[in-house]
């Protein structure tokens, strides 16, 4: 169902997940929670969902963003929906806006990609940025401290035609799995924050006096 590689002292380098597995949202949300728990509290976590609804295969990003926007998320800011997509034309402008709007933003990029036949329908979480438009030989800025790509179809030739003729069912299944993963991760991150706050606010008896615990 998945392949995971890691380095000592680092978050997972490579994680492949099959979106047909019911375990995928739980596994991916655990990975996201572990990685994002190390992000400074002063940083805003921004999910940039890249793509366009003008191409079925390239609609994974905006579909995911639209599903996420329907949820009340405490720890994530969302860019890229069906109504307001992030694509090749406005990508640099969106990234500039994020840098101006947020202090030390931590970006998670979500994008569709093409790959091997055996991996179609898989999600791939990886450290480092994604390079949007690589399959179409576009020269666009890299996006994200980490990224998640969904392998929507087979690559190698006639990429534009392949993206246009990708099954919507495959893309929608990925978007739903991604959305569920982020929602679960958001709840877990919020739970950790509440536990930490409760611990810090807990009165501690010291020398006959009760004082608040200081982390």
Identify the residue ranges that each predicted region occupies.
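N-terminal catalytic or cofactor-binding beta/alpha core of small enzyme domains
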Residues: 1-107, 112-215
């Amino acid at each position: 169902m998945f392949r995971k590689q890691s380095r000592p002292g680092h978050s997972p380098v490579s994680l492949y997940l099959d979106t047909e597995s019911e375990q995928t949202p739980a596994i991916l949300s655990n990975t996201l929670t572990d990685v994002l728990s190390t992000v400074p509290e002063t940083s805003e976590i921004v999910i940039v969902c890249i793509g366009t609804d003008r191409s079925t295969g390239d609609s994974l990003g905006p579909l995911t963003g639209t599903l996420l926007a329907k949820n009340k998320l405490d720890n994530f800011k969302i860019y890229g929906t069906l109504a307001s997509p992030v694509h090749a034309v406005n990508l640099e402008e969106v990234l500039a806006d994020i840098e101006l709007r947020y202090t030390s933003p931590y970006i998670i990029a979500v994008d569709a990609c093409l790959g091997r036949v055996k991996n179609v329908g898989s999600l791939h979480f990886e450290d480092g940025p994604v390079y949007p438009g690589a399959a179409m030989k576009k020269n666009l800025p890299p996006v994200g401290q980490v990224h998640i790509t969904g392998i929507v179809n087979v690559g190698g030739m006639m990429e534009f035609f392949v993206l246009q003729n990708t099954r919507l069912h495959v893309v929608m299944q990925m978007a739903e799995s991604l959305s569920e993963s982020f929602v679960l991760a958001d709840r877990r991150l919020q739970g950790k924050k509440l536990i930490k706050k409760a611990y810090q606010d807990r009165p501690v008896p010291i020398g006959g006096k009760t004082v608040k615990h200081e982390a």
